Each structure stands twice: as C-alpha cells, then as structure tokens.
Amino acid sequence: VLAEVHEHDGYPVNWPDSPGAWLTPPSLIASWVAELDGRVAGHIGLSRSGVGDAAPGLWSARAGLSIDATAVVNRLFVAPWARGHGIGALLMGQAVAEAQDRGLHPVLDVLASDTAAVVLYERLGWQLLATVEQQWSPEQKVTVRCYAAAT
C-alpha cells in the first residue's frame, strides 16, 4: 500500500531504502493498520520525539512541559482506492486515544504541500503551532506545518 500511495501522491517524499524499517522506527510506540473489505487500506504510527521533529519542541515550549510529554503521530497514509470512507480520521482517532491513554500529548509535522493531510488535521480540530523550514539534506529544504491535538 505504501508503494501505491507513493506512486499516487509522492508520500513519502523520499522513498525509503527499507520501507519496513521506515514504518517501524526505533522510536515507535505503537502502530495500526486499517482494513477495508479484507485489504490493507491505511496505516498510522505513534512515536517518541526524534531528531528533526519540530512539533514536540514547539508544543512543549508553549505548554511549559517536557518534550517527553509528547507523542508524534506519523506515517499516516490511506490507499487511494480506500479514500472517502473515514479511514484517515479513524486512524487519527486511534493514535490520539493511545497517546492520551499514555499521558502524552499528540503532535505532528506535515509538509505544507500535503494539502489533503492539512485539511484532515484541521477538520479534526488540530491546532497549528507554527510553519517552519527544515533542511532534510544539503539539497532539500522543505516547509513543514507543525500541529498539536486540541486540548
């Protein structure tokens, strides 16, 4: 499904050498897969803050709490054929509930150019913390929107 999403939407922007490892980083707390009609239709992960995550630091500075009080929602994608069924919102709800059950505040970073994701997050009530520039490599600079789940 990840390859299908990458071909259709360009996500992830940089195709990983090992898609399985990309989906299960060492910082992973939990992940979920959605199925529709017996087929994998989507995925989401929940991780501890890592290098390059801007949203945890922004939220912790605003909240006056440690960055360790956050959980990063990441690796959300829905197969193109499965869109329009609420799968993205369902997966987001699961990740948010898990973070909150662990006493963590959910945050996320998203490319500003990923307008479908931005629309989903804002429709779900996520609050924009900031828009920042990130240097992903010497030749790749991107604009990222940082969000926190509503309190």
Predicted regions located by residue number:
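Hydrophobic beta-strand residues of extracellular immunoglobulin-like
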Residues: A30-V33, V107, R145
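Conserved active-site alpha-helix within GNAT-family acetyltransferase domains
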Residues: A89, D101, S113-A130, P138-Q140
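Residue-level "edge-of-site" marker
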Residues: V51, A112, Q134
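Residues within well-ordered alpha-helical secondary structure of globular protein domains
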Residues: V1-E4, R123
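Acetyl-CoA-dependent GNAT
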Residues: A3-W81, M92-Q94, E98, A150-T151
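Conserved GNAT acetyl-CoA-binding A-motif
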Residues: A99-L111
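Active-site acidic-Proline motif in GNAT/NAT acetyltransferases
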Residues: A79-W81, H85, A112-S113
